[in-house]
From Swiss-Prot:
Keywords: ATP-binding, Ligase, Nucleotide-binding, Protein biosynthesis. The gene is gatB. This is Aspartyl/glutamyl-tRNA(Asn/Gln) amidotransferase subunit B. It holds the Pfam family GatB_Yqey. Its EC number is 6.3.5.-. InterPro entries: Asn/Gln-tRNA_amidoTrfase_suB/E (IPR017959), Asn/Gln-tRNA_Trfase_suB/E_cat (IPR006075), Asn/Gln_amidotransferase (IPR018027), Asn/Gln_tRNA_amidoTrase-B-like (IPR003789), GatB (IPR004413), GatB_C_1 (IPR042114), GatB_Yqey_C_2 (IPR023168), Gln-tRNA_amidoTrfase_suB_CS (IPR017958). One of its GO terms (molecular function) is glutaminyl-tRNA synthase (glutamine-hydrolyzing) activity. Heterotrimer of A, B and C subunits.
Amino acid sequence: MSDDLSMKCGLEIHVQVDTNSKLFCKCPTNYKDVFPNTNICPVCIGHPGAKPMPPNKKAFDIAIMVAKMLNCEMITDKDIYFQRKHYNYPDLPSGYQRTSVPIGEKGNFLGVGITEVHLEEDPGQYKPDLGTVDYNRSGTPLIEIVTDPDMKSPEEAREFLRQLMRLFRYIGNLRGEGTMRADTNISINYNGIQGKRVEVKNVNSIKGVYKVLKYEIIRQKNILRRGGEIKMETRAFMESQMITKSMRSKETADDYRYIPDPDLQPIVLDNSWIERVESEMPETPISKEKRFVEQYGIKEDDSKVLVSDLDLADVFERVIKDVGSDETGISLAVTWVRNELKRVLVYNKIDFFESNLKPEHIIELINSIKDRTISQKIGKTVIEHMVDQKGEKTPKELITELGLTVIEDVSELDQACEEAIKNSEKAIEDYKSGNIRALNSVVGQVMKLTKGRAEPGTVVEMLKKKIDG
């Protein structure tokens, strides 16, 4: 008898807003490259009597933008106020976390329901193994996105998060996967037995969420198979062991003793505020994908690859603008941005931003190929050197330095063709017998002899004249 197994998963995703100052004070939000406990003040370390400033307006703008791009209904008919969420942990100096009521709710992204979007403050960083706490992070604005339990497999959850992180890159002012933390809620139904919901806290990567779900499915299935009962509990992800470990029974809202924060005035999201934020919203990745296909006539797969990296998509459009928006220009842009540049970036495990290249570098390279200063084969070599050297030299500088210009000396090219013909008797015989493709082998010999500096079209013409007489 085969197993009848299904799962439901919902996520609570926390992502930092990249603002200059914290949510309720003027302290800087930089905490990674500074000495511990330096970017702090009485507000963000919870000193008694310290009063918070009004919430960071920029953080609110970004939260509104996120809610709108997740197709949420905006809360405009009642006040947005902050609550105190009480719990005791060393990284929470005041004993409570300030968290807003929903800014937007009842949204949908890629078929997954969005329960709500709200703002809250990040706690500090506690290191249990050292017994130390760094409060530089305390008070940094966080956006929390709570989904409905609509994901039916680890693969669905992984793809949802990938697309969400891509959306965040387009929005900007969000610190993305490097600071993302997700609380993963999962329940399974095994052969008609419904297990209780289990929450796994603070999973800090997309890969981690995927591994948690795979592990929990197996763990919960084995419990139900043996006739046991799934406890409603909170678990921790032990990343080094790729397992989850029980922390405590699952909390309810009552456990956190939510109360409105008396030190903060309610905020009203009026239509003019929302309309202003909407006017500043960028094009979404999905919209850009469709536009690239319709406007430039490229394949859907090519569009997806380009749009997966916002900077790469921008370079693609810059190339078309400078090289030409006709069929030739678009073809060159696809070949050299989507295919060759992307190939080298993937090989080096970096994105365009990390390469330090400029759009002008790619345009200069393509123009060098277009005007036959270099061959396409040499173009591939140049783009590899450009990425290796972090954009320190322009294509023209590299072409000159490496001696990669197309051979213009006819006698040098003639000599290479003669030698290739001499070494390709079988290919020449096949070509003369009507196998036109056999000539490609001879062309390849010439390209090898000239180290790619010959222009293929010129080589073909010269070979045909010599062979055909």
